[in-house]
């Protein structure tokens, strides 16, 4: 059973943009629900946030959740600046946790044929991922399962967007493992 908390991050299905023709205000509904129901398993305190698990006093992992939707115009210019400051401040703070993860909906690096690497996200977050000790960078969006190691970057990049829609065509490269033949998801278990 998946009787555990679910920490959400915003992506294209959470914004009501004309490109995707989804309900306007859908993201705010999710944020409001999480705020009004703090004891539920749905955890979504803001568009970007940090959580240390299992607790802040003795964490095993620090998770920095970001909103990569800025590249599609979903964030205001001021929000983009605020998020950049937040990310840099969280990295500067450090943590007692042996693991630090970055989570965002869109992959920075991807072996999908139609999409590939996201140059805007790489420009925005790439320097921090090269300089700081981030263990894993998680993303979804691309309908594949990927585990990539990119030269010059410290974290492993995990793409897990194979939740049920049509799987994307991928190329095979030296950067890592790609599976576009079956659906799946990630369930992580960290130990000291």
Enumerate the language-model features and the residues they cover.
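Gram-negative outer-membrane beta-barrel proteins
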Residues: 110-114
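Extended active-site neighborhood of metal-dependent phosphoesterases/phosphodiesterases
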Residues: 1-99, 115-120, 124-136, 144-190
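Histidine-centered catalytic micro-motifs
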Residues: 103-109, 137-145
């Amino acid at each position: 059973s998946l009787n555990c908390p679910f920490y959400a991050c915003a992506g294209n299905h959470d914004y009501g943009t004309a490109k995707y023709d989804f309900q306007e205000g859908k993201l705010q509904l999710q944020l409001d629900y999480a705020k009004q129901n703090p004891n539920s398993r749905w955890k979504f305190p803001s568009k970007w946030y940090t959580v240390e698990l299992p607790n802040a006093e003795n964490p095993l992992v620090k998770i920095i959740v970001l909103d990569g939707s800025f590249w599609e115009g979903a964030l205001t210019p001021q929000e983009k600046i605020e998020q950049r400051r937040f990310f840099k401040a969280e990295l500067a703070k450090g943590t007692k946790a042996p693991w630090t993860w970055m989570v965002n909906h869109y992959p920075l690096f991807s072996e999908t044929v139609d999409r590939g690497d996201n140059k805007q996200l790489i420009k925005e977050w790439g320097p921090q991922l090269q300089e700081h000790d981030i263990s894993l960078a998680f993303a979804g969006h691309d309908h594949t399962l990927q585990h990539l190691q990119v030269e010059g970057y410290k974290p492993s990049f995990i793409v897990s967007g194979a939740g049920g829609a049509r799987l994307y065509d991928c190329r095979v490269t030296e950067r890592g493992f790609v599976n576009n033949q079956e659906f799946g998801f990630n369930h992580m278990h960290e130990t000291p």
